[in-house]
Amino acid sequence: MATSNKSKAKTKTTKKVTKKSSASSTSKKATASKVKQSKASSAKANSKSTSVDKSSLATSPAKPVVKVEGSKSFISTAVIFVVLASLASYFMKATTVQIFLGHLTKNELASTAGTVLVAAARPLCEIQIKWMLVGLLVVSTILVILRSTVWGRREQQGIKFGVQPLRWVDFAITGALMFQIVALVNGLQDLVALKLGAFSIALVAYFAWMYERENAATGKPARASLIGAKVTALIPVLMLGTTMLGTIVYGIVRSPWYAYVAVAVFVAWLGFVLLKLNRTTSIGKHDYLASDRAYNTVSILAKVILALVLIAGLYVKK
């Protein structure tokens, strides 16, 4: 009986062990199936997310890529300016003009009882037109090279944000030189008048930059800056017109043909800049690149035409 009881107890314990092992195996199978289900659900979720991302990428519009003028165009422009400078230095006449400074002086004949002052003009220096033109072309070449190399990243940022300060730096420097060349060709030789006209061109560039910056920041046109640019742009135009009229009325002669063409080129270039500036508010952000290219193209054409006109007008056979 004792042995039978022992055998029964052993069978009970073996049954319990088998039950425990079967339960543990079933629990392991259940956990494995849960892990598989979780992996499958995560894989489905990932596939859905990737499909959604792909569909969103396919449906979302591509952002416009801002590109500036290529280095080849800048290099070709610099080469053109260098060639024109070489032609001007070799083929143009050595026509010199004097720079005067107006001042008051004592009239020795009339100053008997007291000092009598009269207006006078003192010649300061003589300068050749061709070297002024060569200087303009050389400075333009340097600015073109800088804008394509050292200032290339600033060019991209300017187009991206809708404000191009480097363009207005170029406008101020080369525009002031253009005005002085055109003024000297037409007989405006007073130092103060020449510098006033050059300073007015720099003010136009400053007001244009302020207008562009405020328009990009607020989206509203800055009327004060625009009016300031237009008013200051009238100063060099009126000075050139008065000088041309004085030549006809008091000089009883007409200026040479290249002097009239030079004035026309300068006024057309200045008018185009003001026209494009006035239309800045109607230009979208994505059209700013086209506007910047138009500025650069017209500026290059104005300098090239002015150089060709003066070379042809002051040409001398070798």
Kindly label every feature range from the protein language model:
Residues 63-166, 175-318:
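Polytopic alpha-helical membrane-helix bundles and their juxtamembrane interface segments
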